[in-house]
Amino acid sequence: MKRRDFSAQLLGTGLGVGLGAAGMAAAPAAFAQAGPVEGKDYIRLSQPQAVAPGKIEVVDFFWYGCPHCFAFEPSLDAWAKKLPTDVAFRRVPVSFRDEPFGTHARIFYALESLGQVDAMHRKVFSAIHNERAALAKPDEVSAFMTKNGLDGAKFLEVMNSFSVQTKARQAKQITDAYKIDGVPALGIQGRYYTSGSVAGSNDRALAVADQLILRARKG
């Protein structure tokens, strides 16, 4: 979903779930022969971003309110679990507008701080897209977390903490540095990014990401 599309598809407007183009099963074999093409399959950052030494960084840029991110999550999660040990995978929630992006970013970082991402990440997606829960107001967030076995009041405290707000601001800086204009998108080693809209489909973007990881490993 492109940045410009978000204003027309905010929460509570009956977001549909779709992934755009699909059926690119031949992509991995083609890439193995020729490699992905800059400008067609991926974008090279004009200003590379610093990454932690020792591992190849892969960043999942997402928004809980994005139907494409929700549909992509099972494939992405399965792919991420099979990444080599020298690859570090992390998620970064985007903030293309003030709200509800800011609230959703802080939900993610509060879950991360509490060690609940694995348990709750897909539940947040499902609540928004299957149950039409906006999760944009404190009472909604608290009730949802309580319903799912967490202390709702404590969650709001963590969500509004300085550390979580700092991480949310840093996430916006990372998103801007990568010049992400739509999600889902994948950043590779601070040098490249790809997405379904760039590569042709989200499955094809994963194949491109595999090749960019190989490229980053070579230096």
Language-model-derived ranges and their functions:
Residues 55, 65-72, 97-104, 113, ...:
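Solvent-exposed, acidic/flexible segments
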Residues 75-78, 106, 123, 140, ...:
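Alpha-helical elements of Rossmann-like donor-binding domains used by nucleotide-donor carbohydrate transfer enzymes
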Residues 83-146:
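Structural microenvironment flanking redox-active thiols in thiol-disulfide oxidoreductases
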